[in-house]
């Protein structure tokens, strides 16, 4: 078989050998992404020292939860366009373990993107109540954070934190997909820091 492969290769051509994967390199530091994260540093230190590591169940559950966050879309206005862009190939939020779900019963995170009106507030609370514990909420954009341009309108809720508890606020009008992605990464750090068993 090897003789056939070498017979098909032109004279003087080198065999193709893939380079060893080096991970995603941070252009600012030149190190792999996550090299400054204390969680991963501790895991790498234990693995290089012993060849295995011992972890508490809570740490294991927290680690698994940060890499498998399922988000419920609650797009109410123009911020929803930027929220949709987060799942497109340029940003690809699923590589961070952040995938969309259509049902609140399968979701861990709800992204409130846009202007929350008084008529929509009960629906927001109902969807939030249908999500399993532990559940997290990201408030995206000026309107969801505090009413935005419509703050003094008679029909607008002045911030969705009056209806549901908010974990991460993403400012902007509308915030870019990069800003939302940064908010997702902050939520993952918050989950790692606080844990998921007791919140």
From Swiss-Prot:
Q: Which keywords are on file for this protein?
A: 4Fe-4S, Cell inner membrane, Cell membrane, Iron, Iron-sulfur, Membrane, Metal-binding, NAD, Quinone, Translocase, Transport, Ubiquinone
Necessary cofactors = [4Fe-4S] cluster
UniProt keyword Cell membrane, yes or no: yes
* GO CC annotations, alphabetized: plasma membrane; respiratory chain complex I
Chief location of this protein? Answer: membrane
Transferase is among the record's keywords: no
Which residues participate in [4Fe-4S] cluster binding? 78-79, 143, 173
Question: Cofactor binding mode, per the note?
Answer: Binds 1 [4Fe-4S] cluster.
The record's InterPro entries line, in alphabetical order, gives: NADH_UbQ_OxRdtase-like_20kDa (IPR006137), NADH_UQ_OxRdtase_20Kd_su (IPR006138)
> What superkingdom does the record give?
Bacteria
Membrane topology designation: Peripheral membrane protein
- What is its biological role? NDH-1 shuttles electrons from NADH, via FMN and iron-sulfur (Fe-S) centers, to quinones in the respiratory chain. The immediate electron acceptor for the enzyme in this species is believed to be ubiquinone. Couples the redox reaction to proton translocation (for every two electrons transferred, four hydrogen ions are translocated across the cytoplasmic membrane), and thus conserves the redox energy in a proton gradient.
Q: How does it assemble?
A: NDH-1 is composed of 14 different subunits. Subunits NuoB, C, D, E, F, and G constitute the peripheral sector of the complex.
Q: Which family does it belong to?
A: Belongs to the complex I 20 kDa subunit family.
Its recorded name reads: NADH-quinone oxidoreductase subunit B 2
């Amino acid at each position: 078989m090897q003789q056939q492969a070498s017979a098909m290769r032109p004279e003087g051509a080198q065999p193709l050998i893939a380079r060893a994967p080096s991970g995603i390199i941070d252009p600012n530091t030149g190190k792999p992404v996550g090299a400054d994260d204390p969680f991963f540093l501790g895991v790498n230190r234990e693995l290089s020292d012993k060849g295995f590591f011992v972890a508490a169940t809570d740490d294991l559950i927290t680690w698994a939860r940060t890499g498998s966050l399922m988000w419920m879309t609650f797009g109410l206005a123009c911020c929803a366009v930027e929220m949709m862009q987060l799942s497109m190939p340029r940003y690809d939020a699923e590589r961070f373990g952040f995938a969309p779900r259509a049902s609140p019963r399968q979701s861990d995170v709800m992204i409130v993107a846009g202007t929350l009106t008084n008529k929509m507030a009960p629906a927001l609370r109902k969807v939030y109540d249908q999500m399993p514990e532990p559940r997290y909420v990201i408030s995206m954009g000026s309107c969801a954070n505090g009413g935005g341009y419509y703050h003094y309108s008679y029909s607008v809720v002045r911030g969705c934190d009056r209806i549901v508890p908010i974990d991460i606020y993403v400012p902007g009008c509308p915030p870019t997909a990069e800003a939302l992605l940064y908010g997702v990464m902050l939520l993952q750090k918050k989950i790692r820091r606080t844990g998921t068993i007791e919140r």
